[in-house]
Amino acid sequence: MTSSLPCGQTSLLLQMTERLALSDAHFLRISHLIYPRAGIVLADHKRDMVYNRLVRRLRSLGLTDFGHYLNLLESNQHSGEWQAFINSLTTNLTAFFREAHHFPLLADHARRRSGEYRVWSAAASTGEEPYSIAMTLADTLGTAPGRWKVFASDIDTKVLEKARSGIYRHEELKNLTPQQLQRYFMRGTGPHEGLVRVRQELANYVDFAPLNLLAKQYTVPGPFDAIFCRNVMIYFDQNTQQEILRRFVPLLKPDGLLFAGHSENFSHLERRFTLRGQTVYALSKD
């Protein structure tokens, strides 16, 4: 004996599973809407990515047409849906101690500086980068109050929630040493088996806040000894890259370091940043 869904439920299920049409006009509108708010340049080869990310948002709202969703955005420039739109289109690929060659350079730089050592993680994502910075500084400088601090920001408010929680799957910590895992994380038990959480003693040194690098003004606790802005600039055009680098200059202390992603080159964009190591730049203030 078989049973079937009522007609209305069947219709709704079909709407939720069938592929929605993303026209050239829709894609162009999306590109024009995201660029001024997040600086993201959407080339045509990003179409499938845009579809896959936004279609989930449409379905969560019960919408079946991209045009209706874009009309919803444009009808209210202050709607909270704009943040959900931005969250959907930002990329959050990260890992603990990603681009591992940066962290010995950070440690060496921190040893040679006096006063409170301050670092800004400008694209913190789900927290792996700022916690990697924090572990490096704790190992290098100790945990005396006022010795160091990490400020971590991201445009995506959803990933910041995960970052603040400090909870990760155990397999995500494969790049940590056994000593770091024991010193800085607590293992979950029972229903939390397989999860770990950043110990509060380390988390206290990391402050998270939402921040858009395209904002007219940065509310950050600078100046900093180092800024991590890795694998972010690749999503911006050259004019936006230059503007962000120009705004970093007064936020870095003399001889401060700027850490870039593996495919990013800043030397030709801002003459005050000179290459110090592999994708690491030093600021010289004349």
Annotated model-derived regions:
Residues P254-H262:
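Conserved beta-strand signature within the Rossmann-like core of class I S-adenosyl-L-methionine
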Residues A226, S267-D286:
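Core SAM-dependent methyltransferase catalytic element
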Residues L106, I227, L252:
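Residue-level signal for inorganic ion chemistry
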